[in-house]
Amino acid sequence: MSLFPSLTLLLLSVVATSYSETVTCEDSQKICPAVIACNSPGINGFPGKDGRDGTKGEKGEPGQGLRGLQGPPGKLGPPGNPGSSGSPGPKGQKGDPGESPDGDSSLAASERKALQTEMARIKKWLTFSLGRQVGNKFFLTNGEMMSFDKVKALCAKFQASVATPRNAAENRAIQNLIKEEAFLGITDENTEGEFVDLTGNKLTYTNWNNGEPNNAGSNEDCVLLLKNGKWNDIPCSSSHLALCEFPI
């Protein structure tokens, strides 16, 4: 057997192998399409890293699907600030008079009667022991001696006023009550020689002693009821019996 054909085939194989390392598969097909074949593809490499996120796209149109059910209500929010008060409503109609049991009504009447009886008894006791009543006035003394200003304060404390006789009957009642000379609610402190009561009204009744008022010492601005029932002007700072009158 001849070795030439075998040697020729071996040389062609070597040349094809060395040439395929520098020539691309495409070029090799052009050069030697009938003799040299391309190698098979290699194994795929590892995936590359993800690229950066792109810019946000525009909002798309609503889908064509059915609208979902309404979700549950959210939590209650904090209470708001209190509102301003509204305007007052119209006045309601007068109600019907109430009804009280007959027993309560009769009890109240009996209690009032008992209270009135007790007050009358106390008034009689005061009149007998400490005071005198004339008409709708009740004259009362505590037996203490003090200045005119203190007498005014004492009477005002008991919602009374300094005794001021308006007629002879009241003057006589005071005279019979006192055992000492007492202040009257009369003065000329505002205008010398013009005696008025403590409300500023001019006197409609007087009972001055002979030669009075004389303003001795130029400081006699108050009036004293003497034991004989006559009046005398004296200094307001002197101390005399406190005498008050109470309206009844």
From Swiss-Prot:
Its main location: secreted. GO terms for molecular function: D-mannose binding. Keywords: Calcium, Coiled coil, Collagen, Complement activation lectin pathway, Complement pathway, Disulfide bond, Hydroxylation, Immunity, Innate immunity, Lectin, Mannose-binding, Repeat, Secreted, Signal. Hydroxylation on proline residues within the sequence motif, GXPG, is most likely to be 4-hydroxy as this fits the requirement for 4-hydroxylation in vertebrates. It is found in: Secreted. Residues 134-245 form the C-type lectin domain. CDD domains: CLECT_collectin_like. One of its GO terms (cellular component) is multivesicular body. Pfam families: Collagen, Lectin_C. The keyword Iron-sulfur does not apply. Disulfide bonds join C155-C244, C222-C236. PROSITE patterns: C_TYPE_LECTIN_1, C_TYPE_LECTIN_2. Residues 42-99 form the Collagen-like domain. Residues 112-130 form a coiled coil. Residues 49-61 have a biased composition (Basic and acidic residues). Residues 82-91 have a biased composition (Low complexity). Residues 43-113 are annotated as: Disordered. The modification 4-hydroxyproline is found at P47, P73, P79, P82, P88. Residues 1-20 form the signal peptide. One of its GO terms (biological process) is complement activation, classical pathway. The coiled-coil domain mediates trimerization. Oligomeric complex of 3 or more homotrimers. Interacts with MASP1 and MASP2. Interacts with MEP1A and MEP1B and may inhibit their catalytic activity. Calcium-dependent lectin involved in innate immune defense. Binds mannose, fucose and N-acetylglucosamine on different microorganisms and activates the lectin complement pathway. Binds to late apoptotic cells, as well as to apoptotic blebs and to necrotic cells, but not to early apoptotic cells, facilitating their uptake by macrophages. This is Mannose-binding protein C.
